[in-house]
Amino acid sequence: MKKIVKSGPGSAELADVADVSADTVIPEYWAEACRHLVKKDRVMKRLIPQFGDAHLQARGDAFSTLARSIVGQQISVKAAQDVWTKFSALPKKLTPANVLRLKVDDMRAAGLSARKVEYLVDLSIHFDTGAVHVKDWQSMDDEAIIAELVAIRGIARWTAEMFLIFYLTRPNVLPLDDVGLISGISQNYFSGESVSRSDAREVAAAWAPYCSVATWYIWRSLDPLPAVAAPAEQ
């Protein structure tokens, strides 16, 4: 279960950042995870208070989340938003069956490459035929879900891990292929020196079983402005 925070209108800079100024869904483990990380990790003890009530925000439905990740591959954020707006407006409702009814020419006209059209069709087929077990995901472990997702064209492990974090809000995902995570670990733990996957795993050993939460704070540490001024070191 997740709890709902109701408050006044507001917005966040990124889709995955939320604060108490918006109606948001907080993963039920978030507070406990923060307590654990502050206790176990010196960097988390410094970072977490800087961002106040900001937290990970779960994203839309499974199909559109994965479709959007495909649309956004290898293009800028602005370009991805423009293409997504055009593509998602093509069907009356964005469902696997409706995407399969779209004409390739119309999808290309929305700004999609031929390869991305193929990927979106394959994604739609997997959902439409039940090749992915959406209703079973809540009871499946992370690696089993990743195995299902990477069988879809255009979805590699990193995309599957982002899906676990931002859609399924799994608490203990460590996306070692994520450039931002590695960069953040380098800056926060190694004074900017080069970091290997082994180094990252060693750092993350203290984060378990809340690697997703720690990763989220590492990402936030790379943002230009924290939500709250950093407290003085004790």
Language-model-detected regions and their locations in the chain:
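Non-catalytic interaction surface on structured domains
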Residues: 50, 58, 62, 109, ...
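C-terminal accessory module of base-excision DNA glycosylases/AP lyases that mediates lesion recognition
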Residues: 1-54, 138, 142-143, 157-234
